[in-house]
């Protein structure tokens, strides 16, 4: 059992991401936006906002972005000649002695100021979130597909030393990072407990047995959920937060359990004399996908949420399919592949849906691990490692585009988005 636990930690620690994906470009004219910043009050802070905002708008795939300093009064005639549609001006304002991040959005076509958005500067290191919220305001003005996912927090476990990991929060670019659980213990596998991101589950390896705890960020309080010999991990939370799927091993071999957060009861829903782990909700929380060695090697199965329900094998390609996440009827998983031309084992991300046998390859090289869907299912974050880099990866499924955000001086054990 100890071997299984170490194996699970180890495989999730095989960090990987692809430098780039094949980019499929369609011929389209994106609205041009010029992002400017003011040097008044706090030029350095405004410049940071400016850089993150410009990058967010580029990442969205909805804008043709250029950057500039504040040019004073808006010269609409000149901007129209340059075929610029919008100007976003970021600045730092001071009101009643308090600093505020401010966005002014100008519509060049109508020659008007159309939006003013203020974001309080509660702490200087929170500037990425101010910029992410500004990007959402600009995007919503054009009624483009939502990019609200940009303002979500990432919760992750980071290695500190032998037997020690801390839990931290970050923005999606990893510019902002803050440790919130530091106790010289093994704190691993964090998983958001609700859509509001005010609570999360995680496993703490105590004196003898691993324990699943729920932590309230605002109150800094803990609640004991479950414990089990050898293994105790929350792998999925239902859309309303009322149920969770856990991998527990009270009798030696791990199985998937369904936990009711209101009744505080757990029900065993797999019974196999082998390994059943990593259950994730499917089909509006009516069924689950999970990883099992029923095929003699790790593979993906699905079943309804009942002990007597039969399990159905989902994949018949590959000899090691694991590390999964799901959104409605879509499943993203890690597939271990043959050695590449450099003699390295490749771990790639693949995407499948329940109503199609088509397997969509999402990465092409390196070690790509821990895929996590965004809350709208349109994007995937993951960890990527190659000999040249270690980064947080982002895949925009609608645009066949990917981005990498370098991870410097941090090694991630697990994360949730």
From Swiss-Prot:
Range of residues in the leader sequence: 1-16
Predominant cellular place of this UniProt entry's protein: periplasm
Gene Ontology terms: biological process: cell division; protein import
Assigned GO CC terms: periplasmic space
Subcellular location: Periplasm
InterPro entries: 6-blade_b-propeller_TolB-like, PD40, Tol-Pal_TolB
Record keywords, A-Z: Cell cycle, Cell division, Periplasm, Signal
Function: Part of the Tol-Pal system, which plays a role in outer membrane invagination during cell division and is important for maintaining outer membrane integrity.
Quaternary assembly: The Tol-Pal system is composed of five core proteins: the inner membrane proteins TolA, TolQ and TolR, the periplasmic protein TolB and the outer membrane protein Pal. They form a network linking the inner and outer membranes and the peptidoglycan layer.
Annotated family: Belongs to the TolB family.
Name used for this protein in its record: Tol-Pal system protein TolB
Lineage of the organism: Bacteria, Pseudomonadati, Campylobacterota, Epsilonproteobacteria, Campylobacterales
